[in-house]
Amino acid sequence: MPLPEPSEQDCESLRAGQEPSVGARKPQESSNLVPARDKERPKPTDVASQETSSTATLPNNTLQVAPVKKQGRIIHRKRSRVDAVPPQPLEFLKTPFGGRLLVHKSFLYKQEKAVGDKVYWKCRQHSELSCRGRAITRGFRVTEMRDHCHPPEKEGLDRKKRHRGRPPSSALPEGAEVQEDEVSLWLYPVEPEPTPQPSIETPEEEQGYRSLALQSLPPKKRPTPGVVRYRPLEFLKTCYGGTFLVHQSFLYKREKTVGGKVYWTCREHAVHGCRSRAITQGQRVTVMRSHCHSPDIEGLQARRQQEKTIKKIQARRIGAGDLEDCDDIEDSLLQGVDSLFYRRGQGTLTLSRSKSKSKSKSRSKSKSKSRSRSRKRAKKQQESSQEPPEEDQDVDPRGPEFLKTPLGGNFLVYESFLYRREKVAGEKVYWTCRDQARMGCRSRAITQGRQVTVMRSHCHPPDLLGLETLRQREKRPGPSQWDGPEGPEFLKTPLGGSFLVYESFLYRREKATGDKVYWTCRDQARMGCRSRAITQGQRVMVMRRHCHPPDMGGLEALRQRENFPNLTHWEGPEPLQPLEFLRTSLGGRFLVYESFLYRKEKAAGEKVYWMCRDQARLGCRSRAITQGRRVMVMRSHCHPPDLAGLEALRQREKAPSAAKKKKKKKKKKKGIH
């Protein structure tokens, strides 16, 4: 009996009630691989698995698709070439801020730079553990440059992969928060949630059109039915005109904007070192890291109260028709010492409305001003007579006190505290506490004419001794402080600069303003010495004392070098032997001199300046200068030479040349054949 055609078999299977599927068509596609019936040898598993789905309902005589010439033989299709194994793609992970990390052998690398089609990567633990692991990617190829100094992060990597491989969740509500993995929230008193707004029912036709429109949106952007919509994000104004983001009783200050995303950092980042971050996109908030401190509930309530007061006054002025003076609302609140700004000191929170008299006076004053603003242009003389007395404004009749700084600037003195000038905006001058950098004090002050407004309280007592010293210096300006007749002494530095020598101390030049030259102590970075000096012609004035004794040995060595300059290496003809250079792993080059490695620092004319490779790791201060084939070393090394590393670099330098020779030999052989 002849076999039916494949189309007839499909029709019969459809008549029997079977649905056509992808598995039913596989035997037709894989007809190049045909098994022959053999009772002794079992059928291959791959062919049997392809045919069982389609031949389960067919009779046994239809199992043979093509005539078989030899039993027990599998006929394979001919292949013209061997299928090459495709290269494995690189694996990357996304960072919380939109970047990417390279995953290679359970190590994480962050991108450093890209040159052409090469991308250079360095270990993610480079800053924390000083790991020098490097990698270079070119297409799908990864080249490791150095070994890691720590084990691979297998547990954290598996956790990140599990987090990345989770199925996409339903659409988030507009006010909901997205909490990243590995982030635990700080326990704090939670604010009462707003009551959900009941949704208004829409007709069936509108719901139908709306459902059709929502089907065209991506799954993540479709609103989930039954989800409560929360209130929009809350923002508060800063005292300098910026905005704070309020989220779960924490305050965030704006950092940057990238596209539709706004990045925020915790306001306590500088004070407490808090590393919490937030990203807002529309009404959605994503918190990156947890806070290391509790929220300032009292301060937040004070800021909200201040915001409400500003809005009330603005509404009153708009209702009275004074649209031109709406920008001066905050100025009226800034009269006095603290106004509505809270103090973050010890004890309970106190606002600056403690006196009942000041309350009544401020109210009557705001009412009288709101009535007289419309007549402001015509009655300027009457307005000057209607101004309240200076007692109500907390204005010192003598004005604020200013003192000269040792370097020629100005200090603001208020309540025995010293403030340094920060910026000027219109008639307002903004000041910061002098001890901001040293003690982290966040106190600010604003001066406008004779008015002084303090923003935050100080975290330290006033420096009365330093204040009295500045006042005495102001009363008796010091021609006696200038050292006159002899004149200052100068010495050459090893790199061609100049040192100021005064009372056996060495000073490094900082800047020059007019005929004055400002100098800092040479040991400022090493010992934190804050001594300063100013030279004007032949006069020298020292500002602060040194915190260390003078370096007599170093001073004598500099004087000897000044008297007997070491120019033996530079005199005479150039040496015949060329300098040795080695390639770095990132494409630069090292200078090799007396088995030490130097990294290029700068070039000035024909001279090239080099510094020791181990400057950052070991603090070595050795320097070298090359001019042609001549080398001059400035300081000795504080460590022995790294002979093993030098030999490894030399072997790496020789390896590419050997590979090139092999390639040339192969090309020659092919040309001969």
From Swiss-Prot:
Residue ranges, compositional bias (Polar residues):
47-62
The answer, when asked if Metal-binding is one of the entry's keywords, is: yes
- Where are the FLYWCH-type-classified zinc fingers? 92-150, 235-293, 402-460, 490-548, 581-639
Q: Where is this cross-link: Glycyl lysine isopeptide (Lys-Gly) (interchain with G-Cter in SUMO2)?
A: K110, K666
Q: Basic and acidic residues composition bias: which ranges? A: 147-158
Primary site of residence:
nucleus
Cite a single Pfam family from the UniProt record.
Answer: FLYWCH_u
Q: Where is this region: Disordered?
A: 1-62, 147-178, 351-402, 646-673
Q: Which domain of life is it from?
A: Eukaryota
**Quaternary structure (record):** Interacts with CTNNB1 (when unphosphorylated), perhaps preventing interaction of CTNNB1 with TCF4, and thereby regulating transcription activation; phosphorylation of CTNNB1 may inhibit the interaction.
Among PANTHER family, the record links this protein to: FLYWCH FAMILY MEMBER 2-RELATED, FLYWCH-TYPE ZINC FINGER-CONTAINING PROTEIN 1
**General function of this protein:** Transcription cofactor. Negatively regulates transcription activation by catenin beta-1 CTNNB1, perhaps acting by competing with TCF4 for CTNNB1 binding. May play a role in DNA-damage response signaling. Binds specifically to DNA sequences at peri-centromeric chromatin loci.
User: What is the protein name stated in its UniProt record?
Assistant: FLYWCH-type zinc finger-containing protein 1
Gene name of the encoded protein? Flywch1
